[in-house]
Structures are given as structure tokens and as C-alpha cells.
Amino acid sequence: MRRNLFVSSLLLIAATSIWSQPAFASENWVGTWKLNTAKSNFGSAAVARAQTLKFEATPAGIKLTSEGMNPEGKPMQSEYTSKFDGKDVVWTGNPSADMACPMRIDDNNYENVWKKAGKAITTAKAVVSNENKTLTITQTAADPQGAASGSVAVYDRQ
């Protein structure tokens, strides 16, 4: 009886450990990425002087932390945690958006709709290169007058 209880306890611990591991570790964008301004194209938009994106797999989902310097040279930081399931999550620290709606497409691709006051304002499509060394984020948006704008930000894996 004691042996069965002991074996059952070990199996329960093993199963709990396996199930508590983040299911997001296979997402190739998980890791740290540094903006490569030389390879990026921001059009006429003001450009961040520096930016680092850190995607971390957690039990609650993938946590994205963005840190850097804005075009005026002031520090900036924003973050959200999402299961990348297409559901809105709070995005703190982003002056352009208060909600993110990231949706996983596959291990190398996801799409994120930025929202402000409930209205979609920007769509970002992220693609990790086949060699997993480059993250390219293509953003499209419309200004208040409805004119389209866009940018392509290229990040190198750190």
C-alpha cells in the first residue's frame, strides 16, 4: 500500500511538472531581439533610437517586454502577457495602444492587432527567419484621416 501511494505520488509530481511547463517554448520568436535600424524602414515615422524585445515563455503565456529609447532619446518600456490566441490583453507602457490582440499563426509567425480605446489602429505581422536569427515586424496603420502608413522593423537575435 505504501509503495503504491509512493509511486502514485511520484507520477502525480511528474505529470504536474510536465503540464506546468509553458506550451510556448516552441515559438521561435521566444528570446531576446535587438532592433537593427540599418535594416529597418520606418518611412516618414519617427524612429526609436534603440529597442530590445524580450519574449519569455511563462505559465500564463508569452510575456513581451519592449525596452529602448524613443525618438527624443527618452527611455521607453512596455509589456503584455498573452497566450497568442487572438484575445485582447492589456498593454502597459505603450503610448500608441492600450490593448494588444496577438494571434499565433505558426512557430515562426504571429499577427498582433494594436487597439486604443477599443479601436484597432495598427496591424503588426511578425516573421522569424528560417535560420531563427532575424525577426521582421511589418506594421500597417491608418492615421486619423484614413491615410495608410507602414513600417518594417528588423531585429537581430541576441
Question: What is each PLM-predicted segment?
Answer:
Residues 1-10:
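Bacterial N-terminal signal peptides that target proteins for export
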Residues 15-22:
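C-terminal segment of classical bacterial N-terminal signal peptides
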Residues 22-158:
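Hydrophobic small-molecule pocket/channel-lining residues, especially in calycin-type beta-barrels
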